[in-house]
Structure formats: C-alpha cells, structure tokens
Amino acid sequence: MAQSVLKTVIARYKTILENQNEWIKPSFKKPQYDLVWNRDYSLTQNCFSINTLNGRVKLSYFSDGMSKYFDYTIYKFGTARLVNKHGKYYLHIPVTYEVEESNISDICNVVGIDRGINFVVATYDSKHKSGFVSGKAIKLKRANYSKLRKELQMRHTPSSRRRLKAIGQRENRWMQDINHQVSKALVENNPKHTLFVLEDLSGIRNATERVKTKDRYVSVSWSFYDLEQKLIYKAKQNQSSVIKVDPRYTSQCCPCCGHIEKSNRNKKIHLFTCKKCGYKSNDDRIGAMNLYRMGINYLANSQVPNTVVAE
C-alpha cells in the first residue's frame, strides 16, 4: 500500500510539471487507492479480495454489463484504482487482451472520415456510400451548458462553484458517451480489415482560437481527440487500422477533377461547387471523399504526405 501511495504522488507531480506553465501544489481531496493485480487485489469465488492496513478483506461486487471482461483466459487485469464517490466504492480496472494485427494486404474497405461541428462525422467508403452524424443536438445541449456555466460564475458562492464543477464533469461524461457511440457505430457498420482515414488535427486548437469569440467555446472545446482515440482502439479490436493524413486542401479539392480553389467551398451554406467542372455536394462530404481517396493512394503505395499510422 505504501508503494501505491508513493507512485500516485509521483504521478501527480509529473502531470503538473508536464501540463502547467507554473508550479501548483498538488492536492488529494478524494480518497483513492491503487492496487496491483494478484498483490493488492484478486478475484476469488465471486468476491474481490483486497489488501488493507488491517489485512485482506473480501467484498462482493456488482458488474452489470461487464461480466465478459472477467474471463481470465482472454483478458488480463492491470493496476486498479479504488475510489469513493458519493458514499459508494468503485474499483476501476484496466484490462488488456491480444488481438490480431491488421496487415495492409488484408485491407478490403476504406472509409474517409471528416470530423466537424455541424456534422460530428461525415463518411465516404469503398461502396461509394456517404454517412452523416448530425451535431445539431450536441451543439444545442453544449450551448445550454455554457449558458448555465456563465450564470453560476457570476454568483461567486461556494455552492455555485461546487455546482460548476459537477456540471463540467457531467458534460464531459456525456460527450465521452457520444464519442463512444459514434466510434462504436463506425467500427460495427464496417467489416474487419477496414482502413479508417482521418485528418491529422494536431494543431486544431491553435486554428480554432482564431475564430470569432462567440464561437470559440464550441470550436476549441470540441472533443475531436477523444473521438479519435476511441476509434483507434475500437478499430484494433476489429482488426482494422486508422491513419491520419495532412488536412490541407481536403475541403477545397474537387474529388472528381482534382481542381483546388479556396472559393470552391461556401462555408456559410456548407456547399462545395467546383469552379472547373461544376461538381456540387455538401462540403463535409467532399472532405470525406478526399480522405477516402488519400486512403486508396496510401494502400497503392503512392506518396501521401505527412501520413501518420495511429498506434
């Protein structure tokens, strides 16, 4: 137990040093305990055996919807974290298992995925089918969260600060659930050995900070990275792969004739009209089509600049 405490404190200091511009003294307000599998905790006879200062205790548990992960022949338990939340104890257990890696030669389907705000994702696949997940309801709900947050910030009371924190956590959980649903649908609606092609949005925060102030909250805080990470690990589970490519000109290039021009895209009405061949379509769909084309080029060993294979 002493070793677990030491490692937790060191990890918190490292996080502060890596993420903060100035030094902030770490605080530990919520009780937590990191447990190493087979040393600090184990699972026997449908009970968890947990090491404490007063010896090992056996505890019954509830695992609704998670029972499949308790098959030791498939899943391997990692270092768990015991936390107390609203008077109840939760054991967060990371599990790992081996999956077959997907080889490029096995790829049978390519899906270009354009991420955005009006549409969470727009897709285009090898069957030349397009798909859209609307972001309208998400934008509306996040706007309501933002309005409520501003009202609470003006009160400057202990209760308003507590509620602010709770609202932030609730919004984060809700957005993570949305990303889980979207990434799960993308993987399940496509066969094994699919290549998903995303834009490399590493610099998205710097770009979105140049938008109008009234739109900045939505643009900067949109969880593109979280969706990306969830898609990567779900794709691996389905023997599929994810690559990230240079996003330049994906919304300005005509997928039919290859003509690139900034005025091809009308952002206000979300319409792409090629000035050369006249091809018209939704601008997000155009982005997905161009990402699909870059995926095909990648498989054909053609030069696709700045391609990153997601790990």
What are these regions (language model features)?
Residues 1-311:
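Nucleic-acid substrate recognition interfaces
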